[in-house]
Each structure stands twice: as structure tokens, then as C-alpha cells.
Amino acid sequence: LHRIVPYGVPANYLTVVSIIIMWTAFTYFVTIEEVNSEAVLVAIFAILLYVIFDHFDGLQAKASQTSSPLGEILDHYSDVFNGAIVVYLCFRCMHLQLGWLFLIVLWFNFLAFAVTYVEQRERRELYFGKIGSLEGVILILLVMLSCLSFAGLDVWHQPGLFSQPNYLLLFTVFLLGFLFTAYGC
């Protein structure tokens, strides 16, 4: 599928396009008060495009042999900011407050990115666990798909384990994933 990208297109252009897509979705969500099913679809579509372009930029850099230190930094930093936007969009689509839980998940997300960046820069190796960031994004997309209906959204707010809302279990799984990533480095 990545072969549809013309060979002469620099990989950094693809990274910039993914940044523009995610920041456009973020700006849209900041300006709306109520998140409806159309807004959830916007978030899902933006994240899907981000994942595709993020994958394609690496393939394009290898295919065209245009990989550069600037491109690597641009890619890493776009992943950090876009990852934070993914967390924000997930919280908004789930109709959750941007309070303490949001800040904790965001902090652990940044921690996982920082640890993997240091690992790559200092030790010249990169650890990929059995469940990585792509699987986490796929899980977020599945959660967002469930938020398209009121019944699906309601599932996350229903009491579950220890009479706590089910979304707490979901974000506990995410936090454990971030910790395993950091520990694996």
C-alpha cells in the first residue's frame, strides 16, 4: 500500500502531514463542547491516518534512502505530541473529565516515550515488547468505535471491578503497558 506514495516525496513530508491531521483533529475537539458520534468518527479517522502516515514515513525514508537525523527527531517528537493528542481524543470520546486520571495517563505516556527515546539514543537499541504502541492505539480505536453508540459509551461508565467504572480498568491496563515499556528498556 505504501507504494502509492510517489518515490520522490520526502519522508518528512509524510510526517508533517500526519502532524497537521492530528493537530487539526485536536483543534476541532478543543472548539466543540459536546462530543457526538460524528466527532468520534473524526477522531477515529484522524488517528487511523496518523498511524498510516507514521508507518509510511519510515518505509519511504528506507525506500528512498533519505533517512536523516532531523527526520528521526521530527518523527519521534511528532509521535510524542500525537500520542498525547490520541490520549486527549480518547478521553473526550469517552466523555471523561480531563482531570487527575487524564494527567496520570498523559504523564505515563510521556514517560514511556522518553524512556524509549533515551534507550535508542544512548544504548543504540530499541526494545519492542509483545504488545507495543501500535497495539495500544488499536485498542484505543476499538474503544472509540464502542463510543459511537450510547450503549457502547455507557459500558465504560458502568460499575465493574470493585464497583469502579469500567474505564478505570481500561486505563489501568494502559498504565501497566506504559510501565512494562519503561521497565523493558
Indicate residue ranges for each PLM-predicted region:
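Topogenic membrane-insertion module of multi-pass membrane proteins
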Residues: 1-55, 177-185
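A feature for the membrane-embedded catalytic helix bundles of lipid/isoprenoid biosynthetic enzymes
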Residues: 1-5, 78-185
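Hydrophobic alpha-helical segments of membrane proteins, primarily the transmembrane helices
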Residues: 9-19, 41-48, 66-76, 103-107, ...
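Structural signal for hydrophobic/aromatic residues that build the beta-strand cores
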Residues: 10, 58-61, 132
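Acidic (Asp/Glu-rich) catalytic motifs at the cytosolic membrane interface
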Residues: 39-91, 115-122, 183
